[in-house]
Structure formats: structure tokens, C-alpha cells
């Protein structure tokens, strides 16, 4: 698991790094992603040792510190230490995740925008849906079209400041949040109908998260639909820069995704840089997946099956690894959001599940 966290924004009911307990919940950034689950794993390992369990293999806990970026930590670790034969990452969902979509973090130059737009800014991390977008526009701009949009308007030093708000969430699940940039681009495009760059972003990138409006609704049976999410927006020398989080189906190649995107974009559109994490697909009939499902189903008295996600964990960096928890089916999604928390009851429950999972993994002879 990992100890690094995504940035915090305003609006928390408790200090985001205070670990305050309210109504049986520990509030703070990282409580679910991923410090809380790693604490559960630590106590699970300690309890297993104290029980007198005699493993056939070595149990190792790996703590990373760059998972939210490019996983440079685990890449370095792999050059220094022999990788485990099998592993879990407590950084996803229960019951067990055996499929993770490919991740393509893109840095885009979309093109020139009107001189009437002096600045536009949103977000700080590619993999977080921004909950605030601001823009500075020239005072001469006709703002009457803004009446149709949910935009705050303020005067600042002889210029007009526009603000749009949304709901932050994980970039792998953009449909669970509200991207503040969408309303901003639609509003600016309405005020500047002849601006091709703004029109492209508003009409193609801010209509849905599955590539339908953009022209590449990629999908497969194994992992589902592609998703794309605007994470960071800036204006440099009049050019609109966007950091885009793309999660693509496992049966597609990243090169195909890039070409499909460029084919359906305006001429000025460029992918300046891209950070790619290849998809993961571990056989559902593997001893690891079957063993973990057995542990989870016994604890929860159910018959759950492995699932696919758009999120990315250390699992794709290790030879035989899958994400196992910590989020339980039906629980409120709080990862990367304001007021992230972990229920103490759930923390105790996941610790018990991890204890049983460690025992199961350590007893496996055939991998």
C-alpha cells in the first residue's frame, strides 16, 4: 500500500490531517486511501504472528510513497529487492479486483483561446476531479450569456473573475463527482461562440466521461467503458493546457487510444506528454484470486465475484498481485473527496479480513 496522499481543498468538517474521530469515523486525508488500510494490515500481521501461526513463506509489508503520481517508489524498489511471488494491495475494493484498466495521464495543448480570456485555472492533480474552476476575463466581454449557467461573477482589479464549483472525486470514477471545469467551459464558449478551442472543449470533453461526445466510446466485456476526466487546467501564453486522466479498457493499446482521440479533435490539439500505466488482468481462476474470494465470502457470508475497476494500484507493478479492499460494496465513496473518513467498525473488519487473507496466502503451495 501507500502512504502518500492527494492534496486537500477547503470545506472539511475536521482538520484534514488531524485524524479526528466523529460519530465513530476517523476523518482525514488518507484514512481510506491508503494509510488506514495499511494500519489494518500492520495489526493483522501482528495478530497473525501472536497467534502462533507458522507460515511456509515470508510475509512482507511494502509501504510506498509515490503511488498517487507515477509510482516511482515501487519502480525503484523493484531494482533493489526481489519481488514477492504473490501479493495484495489494500488500495481498491472488496471482494477482489483482478482487472484494472490502463491509465493514460495526458498533458494536452488544446490550442489558442480568445484574448478576452486572460486566465483560467482548475485543479492540482491529474487524477482528482476539480471542485473549483476560476477564470479572468476582459471587462469588455459580454456576460449576458452567463445567465444560463451557474457561474459566480466578481470584479477584480478592473477585470472580471468567474468561478464555477463542483464536487471532487477520484479521476478513475469521474461520474461520481461534478467537474467544475465543465460549467466554466460551457459558459465561456457561450460568451465567445466563435472561439473554436473553447467550443471543442465544451462540446466534446464536457458532455460525458465515456468518449461518446468526443467520438471514441471504447468498451470491452472484461473491463467496461473508457473514462476521461479533466484534472488540471491552465492558460500559458494564450494556449489552453489540460491535464487529462484517461482510463482505457484492457483489450485496447494506449497508442490506439491516443490516435482515436487525435482523430476526433481539432487541428490544434496536441498530446504534449503522456504517462502510461499498462492495464492489469489476473485470471479469475488463479489460486490467489480464488483464495482471496474464499476469505471474503466466508467473512461476509456471500458469493461475490471478482470485479474490474478504472483505478490504478501497485498491483499492476508486481508479477502476481491484485487489489483487495479496503472499500466495501455499498459504502459511500470517500476516496480523494472532501471529508474522507474510515469507519472504525470497518477498519476493524478489514483488519480481520486481512489477517485471514495473509494466512491463506502464506499457506498456498501452488501459485
Where are these regions (language model features)?
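Acidic/His- and Gly-rich active-site-bordering loop/insert found
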Residues: 1-29, 50-55
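A common structural junction motif
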Residues: 4, 147-154, 191-192, 263-268, ...
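Glycine/charged-rich beta-loop-alpha catalytic/anionic-binding loops adjacent to active sites
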Residues: 17-30, 158-168, 335-336
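Active-site alpha-helical elements of protease catalytic centers
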Residues: 30-45
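Short helix-loop-beta-strand segments that form the rim/entrance of peptidase-like active sites
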Residues: 48-67
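Midchain, well-structured core segments that form catalytic/ion-binding scaffolds
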Residues: 68, 74-249
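An extended, acidic, His-containing surface patch that forms the Zn2+-binding/catalytic region
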Residues: 172-237, 243, 247-256, 268-364
Amino acid at each position: 500500500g501507500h502512504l502518500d496522499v492527494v492534496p486537500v481543498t477547503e470545506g472539511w468538517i475536521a482538520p484534514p490531517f488531524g485524524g479526528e474521530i466523529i460519530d465513530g469515523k476517523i476523518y482525514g486525508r488518507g484514512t481510506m486511501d491508503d494509510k488506514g488500510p495499511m494500519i489494518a494490515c500492520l495489526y493483522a500481521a501482528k495478530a497473525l504472528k501472536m497467534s502462533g501461526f507458522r507460515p511456509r513463506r515470508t510475509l512482507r509489508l511494502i509501504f510506498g510513497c509515490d503511488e498517487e503520481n507515477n509510482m516511482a517508489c515501487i519502480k525503484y524498489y523493484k531494482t533493489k529487492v526481489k519481488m514477492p511471488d504473490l501479493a495484495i494491495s489494500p488500495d481498491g475494493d472488496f471482494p477482489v479486483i483482478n482487472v484494472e484498466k490502463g491509465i493514460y495521464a495526458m498533458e494536452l495543448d488544446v490550442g489558442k483561446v480568445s484574448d478576452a480570456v486572460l486566465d483560467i485555472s482548475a485543479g492540482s492533480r491529474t487524477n482528482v476531479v476539480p471542485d473549483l474552476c476560476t477564470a479572468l476575463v476582459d471587462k469588455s466581454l459580454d456576460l449576458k450569456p452567463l445567465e444560463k449557467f451557474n457561474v459566480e461573477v466578481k470584479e477584480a482589479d478592473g477585470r472580471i473573475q468567474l468561478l464555477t464549483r463542483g464536487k471532487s472525486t477520484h479521476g478513475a470514477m469521474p461520474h461520481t463527482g461534478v467537474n467544475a471545469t465543465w460549467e466554466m467551459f460551457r459558459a465561456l464558449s457561450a460568451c465567445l461562440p466563435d472561439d473554436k478551442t473553447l467550443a471543442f472543449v465544451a462540446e466534446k470533453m464536457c458532455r460525458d466521461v465515456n468518449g461518446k461526445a468526443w467520438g471514441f466510446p471504447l468498451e470491452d466485456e472484461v473491463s467496461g467503458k473508457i473514462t476521461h476526466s479533466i484534472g488540471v487546467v491552465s492558460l500559458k501564453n494564450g494556449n489552453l493546457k489540460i491535464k487529462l486522466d484517461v482510463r482505457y479498457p484492457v483489450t485496447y493499446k494506449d497508442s490506439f487510444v491516443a490516435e482515436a482521440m487525435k482523430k476526433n479533435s481539432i487541428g490544434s490539439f496536441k498530446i504534449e506528454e503522456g504517462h502510461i500505466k499498462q492495464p492489469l488482468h489476473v485470471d479469475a481462476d488463479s489460486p490467489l484470486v480464488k483464495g482471496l474470494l474464499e476469505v471474503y465470502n466466508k467473512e461476509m457470508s456471500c458469493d461475490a465475484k471478482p470485479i474490474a475497476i478504472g483505478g490504478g494500484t501497485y498491483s499492476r507493478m508486481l508479477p502476481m498481485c491484485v487489489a483487495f479492499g479496503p472499500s466495501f460494496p455499498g459504502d459511500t465513496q470517500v476516496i480523494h473527496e472532501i471529508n474522507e473518513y474510515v469507519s472504525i467498525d470497518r477498519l476493524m473488519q478489514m483488519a480481520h479480513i486481512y489477517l485471514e487473507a495473509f494466512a491463506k496466502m502464506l499457506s498456498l503451495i501452488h501459485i
